């Protein structure tokens, strides 16, 4: 995969161990493991971990064509608990985009079983190029 300046420099994603599996405009896959440090008080993956992975996948899917996209809003629905040590994949797709905005949908699921842990939606804004 060619480098993507905006996401290759994502220091939070690097700190959390997020991996870019695939990144093309319109579809991206990010992967991470729900390590012990990412668990909440009831010993399942913290919602912030899943949200951050989905947000990263959204960035991968919208920045892959060379434009700079930033999130202007996002929501998530948690559907089932994500256990410790689960390998999690966030698959982002873009059902709509134009020159200024893109809507991104992300399924967050077990890489092994396909069990869906959460669904995420975001609106991405493309920054204008300097005149």
Q: Model-flagged regions — what are they?
A:
Residues 1-17:
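Extreme N-terminal tail/first-helix region
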Residues 12-45:
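Catalytic strand-loop segment that frames the active site of acyl-thioester-processing enzymes
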Residues 14-16, 26-28, 47, 68-74, ...:
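A generic structural signal for short beta-strands and their flanking turns/coil linkers
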Residues 31-33, 91, 105:
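Beta-strand residues in well-ordered beta-sheet regions across diverse protein folds
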Residues 32-34, 78, 126:
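Hydrophobic residues in beta-strands and at strand termini
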Residues 39-59, 63:
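Compact, glycine-rich, soluble single-domain proteins
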Residues 59-89, 94:
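Hydrophobic beta-strand-centered segment that forms part of the acyl-chain substrate-binding groove
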Residues 82-84, 93-131:
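HotDog/MaoC-like acyl-thioester-processing domains
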């Amino acid at each position: 995969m060619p480098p993507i300046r905006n996401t290759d420099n994502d220091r939070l994603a690097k700190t959390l161990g997020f991996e870019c599996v695939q990144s093309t405009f319109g579809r991206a896959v990010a992967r991470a493991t729900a390590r012990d440090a990412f668990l909440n008080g009831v010993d399942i993956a913290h919602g912030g971990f899943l949200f951050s992975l989905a947000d990263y996948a959204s960035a991968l899917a919208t920045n892959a064509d060379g434009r700079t996209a930033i999130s202007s809003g996002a929501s998530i629905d948690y559907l089932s608990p994500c256990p410790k040590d689960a390998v999690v994949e966030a698959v982002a797709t873009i059902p709509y985009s134009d020159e200024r905005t893109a809507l991104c949908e992300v399924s967050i699921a077990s890489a092994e079983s396909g069990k869906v842990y959460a669904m995420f939606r975001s609106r991405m804004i493309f920054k204008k190029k300097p005149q």
